[in-house]
């Protein structure tokens, strides 16, 4: 039974914002997405890091990567195209330079890792097993598979295999971040669930491009890139809803979240937590603003806890099909 709504602005008792993502426990559902928050240090002048539900720092790889040629980012009418190419200093530098600061920031650190193949994911997970300050791993499985020439995240069996491989070397909670650039997101999420993931993060960016028609040139050095921001929110919501309807695995929703209303849409659709991404570039204090507004929004629904509203979307009753010829006859 759904909680009884209350008028906006009405007083409410304290709301429980705690989140469980499999074995990962978070104090609240507001996380910041990989690649949009640096390694946390860059945002200390804007956000009290310790108040966040979690920080997902920039993705790391086994060895340093220089990333793609410029231009790497292009602003669009309703978002941002990026083609960074996983530019990072590698895991050794991360452990030496970045993790000590993150460990002391007060928020759970969910380390984002990416490999060119399953072996590299396993290698990274093994290195991070037992490292103080690492709360969980997020697998960025939208990177090219060198061995097979396809994306690991677009094949359900490869997704299952990568997650299972990681699961075999670590007891850390594992989140699988999935690409929307597939025909059946549920099948990929099922692969992650069967592999042993604690949760899935939905979604990564959508493929897109931008063109300078006067110069007849692409605006990104890599030609195509990943689209993020408000333009992809409807796609992200659809993916969250579809996975929630079919699977029991917890979901972290991400894609175009700019306001508390956006967060609430994801919660009702089935996400247990959210990640803020592109909004961090436009409004570095957004995570604080949104987190502060969630209790009142939950109060409007009469909810005593976040869990009371997750996955409570009320679907319309299915209507019986009507013969098209009969419908046409009535239309005249």
Task: Give short role names for the model-derived ranges.
Residues 1-13, 227-248, 252, 258-332:
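Alpha/beta catalytic cores of nucleotide-metabolism and tRNA/nucleoside-modifying enzymes
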Residues 1-109, 115:
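N-terminal capping/small domains of soluble enzymes
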Residues 35-36, 255-257:
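Active-site metal-binding loops of divalent metal-dependent hydrolases
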Residues 45, 93, 123, 161, ...:
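Alpha-helical scaffold segments in soluble metabolic enzymes
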Residues 61-66, 144-146, 207-210, 281-283:
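Short gly/pro/ser/thr-enriched loop/turn and capping motifs at secondary-structure boundaries
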Residues 70-72, 215-218, 289-292:
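Short low-complexity, flexible loop/linker segments enriched in glycine and/or proline
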Residues 116-252, 258-269, 276:
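Alpha/beta enzyme core
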